[in-house]
Curated annotation (Swiss-Prot):
<keyword id="KW-0808">Transferase</keyword>
<dbReference type="GO" id="GO:0002098">
    <property type="term" value="P:tRNA wobble uridine modification"/>
</dbReference>
<dbReference type="Pfam" id="PF04055">
    <property type="entry name" value="Radical_SAM"/>
</dbReference>
<feature type="binding site">
    <location>
        <begin position="386"/>
        <end position="389"/>
    </location>
    <ligand>
        <name>acetyl-CoA</name>
    </ligand>
</feature>
<feature type="domain" description="Radical SAM core">
    <location>
        <begin position="6"/>
        <end position="271"/>
    </location>
</feature>
<dbReference type="GO" id="GO:0046872">
    <property type="term" value="F:metal ion binding"/>
</dbReference>
<feature type="region of interest" description="N-acetyltransferase">
    <location>
        <begin position="308"/>
        <end position="459"/>
    </location>
</feature>
<comment type="subunit">
    <text>Homodimer.</text>
</comment>
<keyword id="KW-0004">4Fe-4S</keyword>
<comment type="function">
    <text>tRNA uridine(34) acetyltransferase, which mediates formation of carboxymethyluridine in the wobble base at position 34 in tRNAs. The proposed mechanism is the following: (i) recruits S-adenosyl-L-methionine and cleaves it to generate a 5'-deoxyadenosine radical (5'-dA) in the radical S-adenosyl-L-methionine (rSAM) region, (ii) hydrolyzes acetyl-CoA in the N-acetyltransferase domain and (iii) an acetyl radical is formed by the products of the two domains and (iv) is transferred onto the C5 position of uridine(34) in the bound tRNA molecule.</text>
</comment>
<dbReference type="GO" id="GO:0051536">
    <property type="term" value="F:iron-sulfur cluster binding"/>
</dbReference>
<dbReference type="InterPro" id="IPR006638">
    <property type="entry name" value="Elp3/MiaA/NifB-like_rSAM"/>
</dbReference>
<dbReference type="InterPro" id="IPR039661">
    <property type="entry name" value="ELP3"/>
</dbReference>
<dbReference type="InterPro" id="IPR034687">
    <property type="entry name" value="ELP3-like"/>
</dbReference>
<keyword id="KW-0862">Zinc</keyword>
<feature type="binding site">
    <location>
        <position position="310"/>
    </location>
    <ligand>
        <name>Zn(2+)</name>
    </ligand>
</feature>
<dbReference type="InterPro" id="IPR032432">
    <property type="entry name" value="Radical_SAM_C"/>
</dbReference>
Length: 459
């Protein structure tokens, strides 16, 4: 049966799980099970799929493609999501081999190297237009970022949890708030999208503190992530936190309190942010205390009762609103500027009068040049960190009356970004850290490949 929401945001997500690996963290809330990747539980859907494939990346990707195609979805534009503990702390040879196997599965042919696999994927039937990696803020330095660029990464999810050093110390997180700020800045300056994992309800916090920190994350320019995964704290079987709960040292928020808090957070999120999840996908049998059921309906009801709306990207996407039967109008170009990590972010979007979001572009005016681009593009270069047109995914070259894709909105957004970079900010070039499978699109618009980036001089 075709699940409409699977490709409704314009791409096909394919989750791939690494083999069980040791994690440098010792967080008291993190589940640890034998023969299961760190932070996951044995019966989670992604874990069960990975186990059936012996945690081999090639088998996992091939299986997911076959299942998604059998469900009637296009698989031309794929976003790979690498899951399973802290991948970047694993053996480096394993990392490169794992990513290569993902591309080989998309390509249907085994390449001689990762670079060859990426080149093949530029024109393959199943193109990787996005690649996401999860990591810790303290395992996100320049060396790790360069490795991610080698992989073709476009989005990084940081395990931030909550921006408070006292909480970090209490839960044995192993890093500081300053590490979050530094990692966020580096990721932005290299042109990557930055999402945070956000955990209200941790030991040492309170609903009031969680809300204040949630407000701060968007008011403090050191942070301002592009997206959030809201993961209310759960007491999971076998964790140190479960022992604290049994001893009375920790009590999770009542369900109503947590649902109200999530509604408060959603109400304050800026329109440039995408909230992709509001609860971790952990089977209820492994949850000793805390929320076990989806929050979306309860949160929506609270917001409606307050006459409030969540303005996040997911709630405003063309495809999601179309599925709900909402009428869409004619999109017009909008612009939102905000400071972040020492530079300037310009959020361009096509939206209608009801704020329905058809497409977006994130333009960064960086605070420093990128040496990896060399003399030709290194100085006075702006960064396009994301270009995305929403609506039900269409196959390459396909047209559809009910989709926002393939109407030229992406080209218009990019043309506007080029004009702004040149005329308003005096930049002479743009660089885009695009997915490998999107490179041909940018080549058609005059961009060339330089050190993993698609670059163009602005005449």
């Amino acid at each position: 049966m075709k699940k409409l929401s699977r490709t409704i945001s314009g791409v096909t997500p394919v989750a791939v799980m690494t083999k069980p690996l040791p994690c440098p963290g010792k967080c008291i809330y993190c589940p640890t099970f034998a023969a299961t990747p760190q932070s996951y539980t044995p019966e989670s859907p992604a874990v069960l799929r990975a186990k059936s494939c012996e945690y081999q990346a090639y088998k996992q990707v091939a299986l997911r493609l076959r299942i998604i195609q059998d469900m009637g979805h296009p698989t031309d534009k794929v976003e790979l999501i690498i899951m399973g503990g802290t991948f970047l702390s694993a053996d480096i040879t394993y990392q490169y081999g794992f990513i290569k196997d993902c591309y080989d599965a998309l390509n249907g042919v085994v390449a001689g190297s990762l670079e060859e696999a990426k080149t093949i994927n530029e024109t393959a039937q199943h193109r990787c237009v996005g690649l996401c990696i999860e990591t810790r803020p303290d395992i996100c330095g320049k060396a790790e970022i360069q490795r991610m660029i080698d992989f073709g990464t476009t989005r990084v999810e940081l395990g931030v949890q909550m921006l408070d050093d006292d909480i970090y110390k209490l839960v044995e997180r192993g890093h500081r708030v300053s590490d979050v700020a530094e990692a966020t800045c580096l990721l932005r300056e290299y042109g990557l999208k930055v999402h945070y994992h956000w955990m209200p309800g941790l030991p040492g916090s309170s609903p009031e503190k969680d809300l204040a920190l949630s407000r701060m994350v968007f008011e403090d320019p050191r942070f301002c992530p592009d997206g959030l995964k809201l993961y209310p704290t759960m007491v999971v079987e076998g964790t140190i936190l479960e022992q604290w709960w049994k001893e009375g040292r920790y009590t999770p928020y009542p369900n109503g309190t947590m649902t109200g808090l999530i509604a408060d957070i959603k109400a304050l999120v800026p329109p440039y942010v995408r909230i992709s999840r509001v609860l971790r996908d952990i089977p209820a049998v492994f949850i000793s205390a805390g929320l076990k059921d989806s929050l979306r309906d309860g949160v929506r009801q609270i917001l409606e009762s307050r006459h409030q709306k969540c303005r996040c990207i997911r709630c405003r996407e063309y495809g999601h609103r179309q599925r709900k039967g909402q009428t869409s109008g004619e999109p017009t170009l909008r612009r939102l500027d905000y400071p972040a990590s020492g530079g300037k972010e310009i959020f361009l979007s096509f939206e209608d009068a009801s704020d329905t979001l058809y497409g977006l572009l994130r333009l960064r005016i960086p605070c420093a040049s990128l040496p990896v681009l060399g003399q030709k593009y290194g100085a006075k270069t702006g960064l396009v960190r994301e270009l995305h047109v929403y609506g039900t995914e269409l196959s390459l070259g396909e047209q559809g009356d009910q989709s926002a894709q393939h109407r030229g909105l992406g080209r218009k957004l990019l043309a506007e970004a080029e004009c702004l970079a040149r005329d308003e900010f005096g930049l002479d070039s743009l660089a885009i850290l695009s997915g490998v499978g999107a490179r041909e699109y940018y080549r058609s618009l005059g961009y060339e490949l330089v050190a993993g980036y698609m670059c163009k001089h602005l005449d």
